[in-house]
Design a protein with these regions (language model features):
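Histidine-acidic metal/acid-base catalytic patches
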Residues: 1-124
């Protein structure tokens, strides 16, 4: 990114993949620093943040440390079927009794979880 030198080129980080590849997600975020343009959140098990084992306090602390102001895009994959479920090979439902009501509850949980993290690390 630095060698290209374009303000239109940056880095996208994804916590699901970082969980597999990085020794320390917070350190990786800090290393990327102001080159971070987009940030995808998803748990180690592809569910909503807070439903797995990732250290979300460290992740949001690192985003705060680099003064991140870009997009945060959540990518929980919670049930089989559909184009996305087929494309990423979701082989089992990740929520009990998937239904519109359950999915709505998961979406509400995710929104409240991430809003809480943003308030904790970004709002004075």
């Amino acid at each position: 990114v630095d060698e290209v030198g374009s303000r239109n080129l940056g880095v996208l980080l994804d916590t699901y993949h970082m969980n597999i590849e990085e020794q320390n997600i917070g350190d990786a975020i800090r290393l990327v620093g102001d080159r971070l343009m987009n940030f995808h959140t998803g748990e180690n098990n592809r569910t909503a943040p807070g439903r797995g084992h990732l250290d979300w306090d460290e992740i949001f602390r690192a985003l705060s440390d680099i003064h991140y102001t870009g997009r945060i895009i959540s990518e929980p994959f919670v049930m089989q079927g559909g184009e996305v479920g087929r494309d990423i090979h979701v082989y089992r439902d990740l929520v009990e009794n998937p239904s519109e009501k359950t999915i709505d509850a998961e979406a509400k949980y995710l929104l409240e979880f991430e809003k809480g993290m943003l308030k904790k690390y970004f709002v004075d």
